[in-house]
Amino acid sequence: MLSLIIAACCVTVALAGTFSNPTCAPGRNTIVHLFEWKWTDIAKECERFLGPNGFCGVQISPPNENRLVNNRPWWERYQPVSYKLQTRSGSEDQLRDMISRCNRVNVRIYSDTVINHMTGVGGSGTGTAGSHWNGDTLSYPGVPFSAWDFNTGNECHSSDMNIHDYNNAEEIRNCRLVSLADLKLSKNYVREEITQYMNHLIDLGVAGFRIDAAKHMWPGDLRAMFGTLHDLNSAVFGSGRKPFIFQEVIDMGGEPISASEYTGIGRVTNFIFGVKLGQVFRNENKASNLHNWGEAWGMPNSNDVVVFIDNHDNQRGHGGGGGPLTHFEPRPYKLATAFMLAHPYGFTRLMSSYNFDRSNTDQGPPHNGDNINDVTINADLTCGNGWTCEHRWREIYNMVAFRNIVMGQNLQHWWDNGNYQIAFGRGNKGFIAMNMDNHNLDQTLQTGLPAGTYCDVISGSYDGSSCSGTEIQVGNDGNAHFSISNSSDDPMIAIHVGAKKGQPKVTT
């Protein structure tokens, strides 16, 4: 009996942290959510932009068959019908081609994965691969799942089978999230169908998974399923590599379910991160208070989290809430994103949105009939045809390279004016200064950088020989003078050794 207990403990220890490594190619550290993009457009973006600019990877929208909903809202992608790989984003062949092309340029693919539930209960119809479904009888022959494969009144004790009491952990995990048919993940058959789907994606070459609604699943069920996942495709990643798993756990405090229950499995999404930074960069909390940003603010360990300013849900006022900054407020949004990318806390994810009417938060991606529009690229590298593409804003993609260059370097040389002007360095690799105050910043600061002329990667870029924006001269003593107008569209300056005149341009 004792040997069995010891063996079980060893399995738990072996699993802990196994799925927390983002599996980026060397020198890359940031992923971007290309929300509702087609697979063909993602493949092109990997080759023409993400690879050359040092991005680690792409979070893609759920690739499995989903319910067809009138007017095609974005959230139909989060109502599975089967695990067939056919959606508005494209076919399985197009998905396979995209994954292969992105991996060839060192850009990894992370699949948004919906395994807590199927469609909403009630009604019937077909999915994006033509599979029939019936939410009245809980019949999903495309998997197949039947009524036996869902939680019932034996597991869920709310009056209508829906979640109402967020102070009741059992109800949160055993009942229906907004009337979505809740899978019985304690059942081996259900687990096997889910892991077969995830393993198929691994075999196609994905690097990992975002687990949607992880908070609504028991950690033990997730451990059991993830323990049977394949290693990553050895032709791409080498042998013995595990997929990266990051779990959507909305933990704003005050509820019985905490993110810490899931950090032993993989990473968790840190929603408080974006909410708190939003308060600072809207000038609701002094920027000087960021001097101890991270765990000292009551947030989880840096190695346990994926951090972000906004995501596809909370930019629409859905899950997570808290009024995060979004692309609708570009000035503070760029500042907050630059701070996130310059600071060592967490593994960073960017949001890449499409334009939508804020009075219609259900609005789906730019489309022509049932077809998602192509992503078109303007002369200034921004996107057209209804796509916002925050990841293509210069102030953001240049900071992706900044993060790559300074990775592993300690935060040092912190300076602030006690209010809304701050600056800090990352070892001897990079330095950033920001001014959110109501007056100009005019300071000589210690950067920690080697002497030379650096290109500010906020106001411009470095092409390997010259700067298109501001130049900053660092003296032999490491000091440099910074002048930042409080009325600037981008009141910040960032420099790093990969954008130093007289040396090659480096992004990873």
Swiss-Prot record:
> Per the UniProt record, which EC number(s) apply here?
3.2.1.1
GO molecular function annotations of the record: alpha-amylase activity; metal ion binding
What Gene3D superfamilies has UniProt attached to this entry?
Answer: Glycosidases, Golgi alpha-mannosidase II
Q: Give the record's cofactor note, including how many are bound.
A: Binds 1 Ca(2+) ion per subunit. Binds 1 Cl(-) ion per subunit.
Q: Which reaction does it catalyse?
A: Endohydrolysis of (1->4)-alpha-D-glucosidic linkages in polysaccharides containing three or more (1->4)-alpha-linked D-glucose units
**Alphabetized SUPFAM superfamilies for the sequence:** (Trans)glycosidases, Glycosyl hydrolase domain
Database matches in InterPro entries: A-amylase/branching_C (IPR006048), A-amylase_C (IPR031319), Alpha_amylase (IPR006046), Glyco_hydro_13_cat_dom (IPR006047), Glyco_hydro_b (IPR013780), Glycoside_hydrolase_SF (IPR017853)
Q: Where is the active site?
A: D212, E248
Residues where Ca(2+) binds: N116, R173, D182, H216
Keyword entries, A-Z: Calcium, Carbohydrate metabolism, Chloride, Disulfide bond, Glycosidase, Hydrolase, Metal-binding, Signal
Q: Name one Pfam family in it.
A: Alpha-amylase_C
- Describe the family membership recorded for this protein in Swiss-Prot or TrEMBL: Belongs to the glycosyl hydrolase 13 family.
Oligomer status and interactors: Monomer.
Q: What is this protein called?
A: Alpha-amylase
Which organism does this sequence originate in?
Pecten maximus
